[in-house]
Amino acid sequence: EKLEAAVSIGLSNVCRGAASFAAGFEEARHALLGTTVLKGTPGVMAYEELGPYKYLLRMPFDGGVRDAHRDAVARIAEYDRQRSTALLRTLEEFLRRRGSIGATAEALYVHPNTLRQRLRRIGELSGLDLRKDDWLMVEIAVKMVRLQEALGPGERREPK
């Protein structure tokens, strides 16, 4: 009988002596979490690949950081969970491609009109206006929601 297992690995920066082991462990743990949040699949990730997540993971975080953008993105994530849709992924790709309908539609393998319909639905659900809202705030909110999903409900992170 052949068993298949999915393995994720988080890599820290090089530790130079016992004094840096605790920091190295935290970096590796954060990189491991990054495989879930950034890649969405098991794999290998180095701490340096985390980008802005390095900073978000260092903040005290219990999901209680609330603002209108985070609440809006959380509504999209909840809608996706309940209906097995991918509106949050659509929003992420749209932001990643700096609002390009063509590039986002291509990345998602959908027709541009389908993308426009999804963006309208995102606006209806969340109250976000992607023509006016601060995209950086929306991007940070998306990352915070993804981190909370990866940490699981009710898990609390203390500052390190």
Show the residue positions of the predicted features.
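Cytosolic nucleotide-utilizing catalytic cores of signal-transduction proteins
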Residues: 1-160
